[in-house]
């Protein structure tokens, strides 16, 4: 049920925020297709966007460049809009190996994937909210430009139930099977249903805590009620309910039959081409694989790798863009591209990499040519589909500036009064010894240091040198996976070590108020890692500390250094002037280390409270906040097994308590991974 957006915040817009909000809203109301918000680190860009959403009351999609930042934004938006639908849409693969063929070694690699069920449920919840409500904010990663089920077919497949409706039990069960729900009278879990006499219990695929009970009298729906799937306790009775398919890729039977005929036609044409070119092995391989898939589709309605036939299943022509999350966003929706200088190039690069891999599969007879149309959006298709857009970045790229016509909305003043770091340029000759002395000063007063180098070798050597001199130092590099990277950053904030050395990873979105010094070695080596944008982003990591300082080691000042220093000075002067006019004393940010990770804690508690007031709610003290993501995943699996065991033994009180703890652990796990 849609409600108006209601912003929940103890703060009012201040600094540059009111002017930025006014200009963005005016631009949107005047029909501007592209606007850029240049917001410095710590200026409250997310709060500004939340105010724009609340004032204009428009459904919004926020694109983030990676899962880490998406989780951070999801948590912040949840806090700003607790009464509205804030959803999370990222890739649901914990592990994904696409099918590929390496001709040089004649090696075929089968597709292998591990799906995270909780994120799959959140994706289904996101599309349901976009179809049903207007008060929706979906925080998505670049996963949003990949093919998703056709929204028209998805809507056609929905099962609407209303009290008083004439429908027999078999018809309901048949429709549930078409929606890919499985009957399971023993273990009642997401995406299943069970039958007891004239009562059908259905656990919706997009829900994690509420199930539907359908009570029939002869061939009439007598009662619909929502209940807690663990305790069986009725939460409410309702007049109607819509059951959505278990997956985005569900297709009506008649469409599958039609698609199979089209696949057979393409197979015949492709076989002819391969035989004419004397490719007998490829022809045999393609025929065998495709006919097996056709048999599976005929018997079960789906097959492994069915996404490779998505063009036929959605009725598209060759080369047409696939349906994506953008097709679920209303025409008057709003798109916010966070860290746009990274996100926009990412979107542009997805199509070509995917295409190169699939062309090899088609050439060697592993797939039909139509598999090339199972792909992410091309950049020009993304541009055509995108609604009115706000690009958000501290260092907007040329694309965003060009699209906005050079009219940039500035948000340089921080409400906290924090100034941009003081920048010093020092000679390269003594950079390592000078850095060691600076590190010791910072470590003595419990502050942290980030050091960025140009090469992996130099980062390793520097780490070794600092360790030999007794400093607590860690090295962050590209071989470290996302989960471990989060752990290292958390340990730095907790004071497990004082110095973090990296190359190109200490940039966008890293929120570390404890860092008071950023050292950039070889800053005068002009190039990608020492461009104006890279320097500003790296310097910005010290902008959340009241003693923030950046040291650029270089023997000359390059054009990029001059621009970065000039821009930082401009922002610093503007902030200083604002502080003097309003009598503000800069204050450091005391952000708890668990804030980002515990993004769903309060929501989980609220959900639990509504279900059974007599039950004790699991307190945060009982949830191990400092667990690593790998340990969290193991703990979740253990608790799920224990919860089901309690439920089967009819020990509902114990099962419910474990379920409440699982809510917190799952939210922690999403943020951490």
From Swiss-Prot:
Motif Beta-hairpin: where in chain: 92-115
Subcellular location: Cytoplasm
GO cellular component: cytoplasm; excinuclease repair complex
Main location: cytoplasm
UVR domain ranges (all copies): 633-668
Residues involved in ATP binding: 39-46
Domain (Helicase ATP-binding) ranges: 26-183
GO molecular function: ATP binding; ATP hydrolysis activity; DNA binding; excinuclease ABC activity; helicase activity
Biological process terms in GO annotation: nucleotide-excision repair; SOS response
Xref: CDD domains: DEXHc_UvrB (cd17916), SF2_C_UvrB (cd18790)
SUPFAM superfamilies given in the database record: C-terminal UvrC-binding domain of UvrB, P-loop containing nucleoside triphosphate hydrolases
The keyword Transmembrane helix appears for this protein: no
Region described as Disordered: spans on this chain: 608-627
Disulfide bonds: none
Keyword annotations: ATP-binding, Cytoplasm, DNA damage, DNA excision, DNA repair, Excision nuclease, Helicase, Hydrolase, Nucleotide-binding, SOS response
Complex and partners: Forms a heterotetramer with UvrA during the search for lesions. Interacts with UvrC in an incision complex.
UniProt domain comment: The beta-hairpin motif is involved in DNA binding.
The protein's role, per its UniProt record: The UvrABC repair system catalyzes the recognition and processing of DNA lesions. A damage recognition complex composed of 2 UvrA and 2 UvrB subunits scans DNA for abnormalities. Upon binding of the UvrA(2)B(2) complex to a putative damaged site, the DNA wraps around one UvrB monomer. DNA wrap is dependent on ATP binding by UvrB and probably causes local melting of the DNA helix, facilitating insertion of UvrB beta-hairpin between the DNA strands. Then UvrB probes one DNA strand for the presence of a lesion.
Family classification: Belongs to the UvrB family.
Protein name: UvrABC system protein B
Organism: Escherichia coli O81 (strain ED1a)
